[in-house]
């Protein structure tokens, strides 16, 4: 009798397959007692994460994103930051969501190919007002990298403590590479003398794009659309060619261990890196304003 029942059950399973639940095998763990610990692939078979299935962070502050989420965030942050370039948080988000899967790894590999870059990756230094000892930098001779840097900070009214932490890059080492690039940005300003006005930022971003290939730096050039005619002419005539020429020929600026060259002559460092100082943008803008005032005064007189 028992044998007959087993055969009947087996026959029913073979002849009525459509009565069984239709579900992907890899999506849910089996009810079998031998599969109480499903693999991450079984728990997360799709690219969309829910609040219950999102992977754990790989480092403090990390926010894992699916491909769809990362794409949506990249498009949204890119469009809004083009319209409002003062949104540093969105610019940072766009940089992170567009740097993978290729660009940030290329920058990491550039660091690994350099002895100094490898030391930076090993030491993981951070650039803050505390780590740099700003009062000490003010005491350095005017021709040093440190004094040039602090003088630029004071003149532009900015601080090294304003850089957002990286959140959306999955690889922990690549996240540090992005953080390092972000915190070194003001050193690039000081090295080139470019101010933080929109025109200066676009010129520096063009230089960074030629040197690092990070997509965010290239997108920044499109903000020229919202700039004045004189500013666009100045970029295409002066700062754009300078940025491309210097960015391509200069050594990888991400490999400069800034903390170790603060007492170095800034002119010597520029020569070693292959970076020329462009025309003084603030001075050009000042002369332009004065010329405009003279023309207006002459027209009234």
Swiss-Prot record:
Single biological process term from Gene Ontology: ubiquinone biosynthetic process
Keyword Repeat assigned: no
Pathway(s) this gene product operates in, as recorded in its UniProt entry: Cofactor biosynthesis; ubiquinone biosynthesis
What subcellular locations does the record give? Mitochondrion inner membrane
Identify the stretch(es) annotated as Disordered: 14-48
Q: What is its main location?
A: mitochondrion
Which Pfam families does this chain map to? Coq4 (PF05019)
Segments crossing the lipid bilayer: none
Keywords tagged on the record: Lyase, Membrane, Metal-binding, Mitochondrion, Mitochondrion inner membrane, Transit peptide, Ubiquinone biosynthesis, Zinc
Per its UniProt record, the required cofactor names are: Zn(2+)
Q: Which GO terms describe its cellular component?
A: extrinsic component of mitochondrial inner membrane
Q: Start and end of the transit peptide?
A: 1-46
HAMAP family under this entry?
Coq4 (MF_03111)
Subunit info here reads: Component of a multi-subunit COQ enzyme complex, composed of at least COQ3, COQ4, COQ5, COQ6, COQ7 and COQ9.
The name this protein goes by in its record: Ubiquinone biosynthesis protein COQ4, mitochondrial
Organism whose genome encodes this protein: Podospora anserina (strain S / ATCC MYA-4624 / DSM 980 / FGSC 10383) (Pleurage anserina)
The coding gene here is: COQ4
